[in-house]
Amino acid sequence: LSLRGEQRTVCESLIEVETFKLKIYGESQITFNNVNIKEFDVDVYGESQLTMQKGIIDYQSITAFGEGKINAVEVKNRKGKYRAIGEAIFRVNTSEHIKFTAFGEAELYYKGNPEIDKGFGVGASTINQIN
């Protein structure tokens, strides 16, 4: 799925799939009310916002280019890989493992007790637990 521009999109029904790829461009606001996804791959370009209200994701890989805001703190996630080029903000709920790589002033806020692997990065990125 690819979304562009400055639109607001709400997926009201349950998204239940093995693999879901999402690309967001511009200043879009995307909300998923409920998800059940095995592998979720997201690329965010610009100042877009992605919000997930509830659900389960086994593995998620999210890359933000710019000032993207990702709010997935209400979604139970086992493993996650988060990359930022810019000033992105990630809010996630991950139980086992997080890999976080940032170039810029990105922020990662996480719920759970995962192992944290901070990849190579440049800039003043921060990682904070929010339990």
Protein language model regions, located:
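Short "repeat-start/strand-capping" segments in structured domains, especially the N-termini
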Residues: 1, 13-22, 32-42, 52-62, ...
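Extracellular beta-strand-rich, repetitive "passenger/adhesive" scaffolds
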Residues: 3-6, 25
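Residues at the loop-to-beta-strand transition
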Residues: 7, 28, 48, 68, ...
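Short acidic/polar N-terminal linker immediately downstream of export determinants
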Residues: 9-11, 125-131
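Solenoidal tandem-repeat scaffolds enriched in leucines and small polar residues
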Residues: 50-51, 64-70, 84-86
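Glycine-rich hexapeptide-repeat left-handed beta-helix
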Residues: 104, 118-123
